Amino acid sequence: MKKISNNIFFIMLISGTLITISSNSWLGAWMGLEINLLSFIPLMNEGKKNLMTSESSLKYFLTQAFASSILLFAIILMMMFFNENWMMNNNFNNLLILSTLLLKSGAAPFHFWFPGVMEGLNWINGLILMTWQKIAPLMLISYNLNINFFYFTILLSMIIGALGGLNQTSLRKLMAFSSINHIGWMLMAMMNNELLWLTYFLLYSILSMSIILMFNNFKLFHFNQIFNFSMMNPYIKFFMFLNLLSLGGLPPFLGFLPKWLVIQNLVEMNQLFLLFIAVCLTLITLYYYLRMSYSIYMLNYNKNSWMLMNSYSNNNLTLILTMNFISIMGLLIITLIYLIL
């Protein structure tokens, strides 16, 4: 019975997002966001109940409900003084709606809830929060651009995403700050080209899925568990290492492709200062990916070697290997196809 209810909530989750992105009015978009929110809360509480999960779901609900109420208030204001359409002439209303959507997506300076919520979720729900839950608000943001405010948000997202992950021992919080940094890149892509941010988001989702499925399969949540991970299969360690480099955006892996496209676009638009800051801050995020890789290869903590005994399964091994192959070899395959055609 519980599995059936979870499937229903999952279908509602997908439906809410589709309603939002296909709506031709702000009120319809708001309704889709609410369906999405109310269907994700039960999914957050599935499985083993603990205080961290309950706290995360409550934080998520309060933050999203607050954002939804402000969004509804802004929509009502707009309907009172203007026509109910996508283009707005009122700067205050524009900024109010943009702020609520940034709060829903977890971008800086409205990111405060995101790492704390991620910490209390299992990896699969964390993956949904990092990817699917961002589609609807980011799509609405792309309809409602405010370039001056965008520069501030992009720079702050990249700074917080880079510096926030430096002193983290929790892998979930580290992935949360990584996600905040990637949101900065997506907003930067969105500023110049709508198709470009969708491409970036799709590739980011593939990379996140690849690494999170490995974390989930091997029950890795903290850095000290990675020390024990060093005792495992060397091929698995190698795949984990390459996945982290790919997520960091190093060539010749798939993670380099979205950054390459954004860099090319920024050079064409002559936004070199923004590009310089973005690349410098991304190097900091690459540092904490390399720190994880160093933990996998160099450190061995035998004292707790029993912790990982029988803690992983081979149930999703085919999916994990497929996602690893795409993440690691994707750019090379795309390049070969391009050269052949």
UniProtKB/Swiss-Prot annotation:
Keywords: Electron transport, Membrane, Mitochondrion, Mitochondrion inner membrane, NAD, Respiratory chain, Translocase, Transmembrane, Transmembrane helix, Transport, Ubiquinone. One of its GO terms (cellular component) is mitochondrial inner membrane. InterPro entries: Complex_I_Subunit_2, NADH_DH_su2_C, NADH_UbQ_OxRdtase_chain2, ND/Mrp_TM. Its EC number is 7.1.1.2. It comes from the Eukaryota. Pfam families: NADH_dehy_S2_C, Proton_antipo_M. GO terms for molecular function: NADH dehydrogenase (ubiquinone) activity. The chain crosses the membrane at residues 8-28, 61-81, 95-117, 145-165, 195-215, 238-258, 266-286, 320-340. It is a multi-pass membrane protein. It is found in: Mitochondrion inner membrane. It catalyses: a ubiquinone + NADH + 5 H(+)(in) = a ubiquinol + NAD(+) + 4 H(+)(out). GO terms for biological process: mitochondrial electron transport, NADH to ubiquinone. Core subunit of the mitochondrial membrane respiratory chain NADH dehydrogenase (Complex I) that is believed to belong to the minimal assembly required for catalysis. Complex I functions in the transfer of electrons from NADH to the respiratory chain. The immediate electron acceptor for the enzyme is believed to be ubiquinone. Belongs to the complex I subunit 2 family. This is NADH-ubiquinone oxidoreductase chain 2. It comes from Aedes aegypti. The gene is mt:ND2.
